[in-house]
């Protein structure tokens, strides 16, 4: 696993719009969609967004989200949390993950 390196929030926003927005929101108080609202995700344990129905796998994983484990998760979500209902296949390019996480850090705080 490689260490997270801050990327381009602008490129990350574009990635979010094309790869994530169909299932997630980021604004405070935003609705859950197919996936949970991601506001406040960094520093929160997996499976803990209030009002969202997670799989047991997400709850039991109990990972405290930070930039590094988020990058590992986004590489291959179903490998990182077997049993997750996240259908997204992952972002294979480290640069894309860094850009997306940089955007999420700003958009979700």
UniProtKB/Swiss-Prot annotation:
N6,N6,N6-trimethyllysine modified-residue sites: 78-79
Key words, A-Z: Electron transport, Heme, Iron, Metal-binding, Methylation, Mitochondrion, Respiratory chain, Transport
GO molecular function: cardiolipin binding; electron transfer activity; heme binding; metal ion binding
Main location: mitochondrion
Cofactor binding comment, as recorded: Binds 1 heme c group covalently per subunit.
Pfam families: Cytochrom_C
GO cellular component terms, A-Z: mitochondrial intermembrane space; mitochondrion
Subcellular location: Mitochondrion intermembrane space
Binding site for heme c: 20, 23-24, 86
Cofactor: heme c
Any Gene Ontology biological process: mitochondrial electron transport, ubiquinol to cytochrome c
Expression induction or repression: By oxygen at the level of transcription. Expression drops rapidly when the oxygen concentration falls below 0.5 uM O(2).
PROSITE patterns named in the record: CYTC
Family indicated by similarity: Belongs to the cytochrome c family.
Reported function: Electron carrier protein. The oxidized form of the cytochrome c heme group can accept an electron from the heme group of the cytochrome c1 subunit of ubiquinol-cytochrome c oxidoreductase. Cytochrome c then transfers this electron to the dinuclear copper A center (CU(A)) of the COX2 subunit of cytochrome oxidase, the final protein carrier in the mitochondrial electron-transport chain. Isoform 1 (CYC1) is the predominant cytochrome c during aerobic/normoxic growth.
Xref: PANTHER family: CYTOCHROME C (PTHR11961)
More about this protein: Present with 7330 molecules/cell in log phase SD medium.
Protein name, as recorded: Cytochrome c isoform 1
Species lineage: Eukaryota, Fungi, Dikarya, Ascomycota, Saccharomycotina
């Amino acid at each position: 696993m490689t260490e997270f390196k801050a990327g381009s929030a602008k490129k990350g926003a574009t990635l979010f719009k094309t790869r994530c927005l169909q299932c997630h929101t980021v604004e405070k108080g935003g609705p859950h969609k197919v996936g949970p609202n991601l506001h406040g995700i960094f520093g929160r344990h997996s499976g803990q967004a209030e009002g969202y129905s997670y799989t047991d796998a997400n709850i039991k994983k109990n990972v405290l989200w930070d930039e590094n484990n988020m990058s590992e998760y986004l590489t291959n979500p179903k490998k990182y949390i077997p049993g997750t209902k996240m259908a997204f296949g992952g972002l294979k390019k480290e640069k894309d993950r860094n850009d997306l996480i940089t955007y999420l850090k700003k958009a979700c705080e």
